[in-house]
Structure formats: C-alpha cells, structure tokens
C-alpha cells in the first residue's frame, strides 16, 4: 500500500506542475519546429559541396570512408581525363554513397576531410519510404550541399 500511495503522490505532483505550467510538454511537430532553436553544435546529416567553379570539392581520398565508424560511406574513385581543365586533381568520386540509416551523425567525416568537401547540415527530418531511398547518392548529396565559397574555419578560435 505505501508504494501505491507514493506512486499516486508523484502522479499528482506532475499533474499539478502541468496545470501550473512548470513543466515542458512535447513539441507538436508539424506545427512547431526546432529550426530556430537548434544549437550551433547540432550535427545533422552529411552533404557534399561544390567549389566556386562548380567542381566537386571531393578528391576521392577516401579518408571519410575509412574513418566512418558504422561504414556508412562508400566511395568509388575515378581518374579525371587529361583533357579536362581540372586535370591537375588526380581523382574524383565516380560514386559517393552515404547510407543515412547506418550514419550516426558523429561528424568524423567532416573533421577528417582535407578538402572541406563534406559538411553536416542542420536538418533533422530525413525520411524515406524504403531503404533504397535512404541511401543518398552523389547527385543528391551535391544538390543538398550546394556551393561553398572559400575556406571554412572549423575550429573555435575563441578558445
């Protein structure tokens, strides 16, 4: 009996706090969104970016593929033809796939990238009806990432 009374006391305390507005309530998702409340350190899904010339920044070094803990990234490197104006870069990704179901959004791929070609975006609604839709290919990753101008300072200079 004492356990039941203690449980009811806790329930009444929570109910009282709810009526007085002292507790947080679940956010009603479609109407309310976290977009304005996301912290600066939020890590979303990865995306590829292009440089100012429209070239894919990724040089297919495969560091992100090797460092990815769940092995969510798959890259097939290819040679750039010598007739191309960007032939000085020796490789480019023929295929670049990220399995968003396996990705744990740790940010290690972003940190290890020497070309600043992969960034974690700030969206949290990543959906799909099938497993195949959750594997983002190079074209989709580039569409999401867009163009990145200049060099981005990834480190906090205030510390």
For each feature predicted by the language model, list its residue ranges.
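Non-ligating segments of multi-cofactor redox enzymes
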Residues: 1-102, 111, 115-159
